[in-house]
C-alpha cells in the first residue's frame, strides 16, 4: 500500500477543503397555504401536493 512521501501543507489541505461546504436547501412556496416547503414534497402545514390533499394534518390550536 503506497504511503505519502511528504506531508501536505496547511494551504493545500485548506484549498482542498474549501469546496466541502454544504449548500442550503432550496425552498418553494405552497400554492395552497403559501408556506415554505421543499419542492416535490407534500406541504407539512396543509397536507396538499399538486392541488390534492394527500396528508391529513391535525390543527394544534388550543
UniProtKB/Swiss-Prot annotation:
Keyword list, A-Z: Ribonucleoprotein, Ribosomal protein
Gene Ontology terms for molecular function: structural constituent of ribosome
InterPro entries in UniProt: Ribosomal_bL32 (IPR002677), Ribosomal_bL32_bact (IPR044957), Ribosomal_zn-bd (IPR011332)
Pfam families the UniProt entry points to: Ribosomal_L32p
Ranges of biased composition (kind: Basic residues): 1-19
GO cellular component terms attached to this protein's record: large ribosomal subunit
Region (Disordered): 1-23
A GO BP entry: translation
Family: Belongs to the bacterial ribosomal protein bL32 family.
The protein, known as: Large ribosomal subunit protein bL32
Species assigned in the record: Koribacter versatilis (strain Ellin345)
Amino acid at each position: 500500500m503506497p504511503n505519502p512521501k511528504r506531508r501536505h501543507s496547511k494551504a493545500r489541505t485548506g484549498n482542498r477543503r474549501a469546496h466541502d461546504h454544504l449548500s442550503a436547501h432550496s425552498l418553494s412556496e405552497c400554492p395552497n397555504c403559501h408556506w415554505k416547503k421543499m419542492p416535490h414534497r407534500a406541504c407539512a402545514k396543509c397536507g396538499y401536493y399538486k392541488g390534492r390533499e394527500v396528508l391529513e394534518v391535525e390543527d394544534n390550536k388550543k
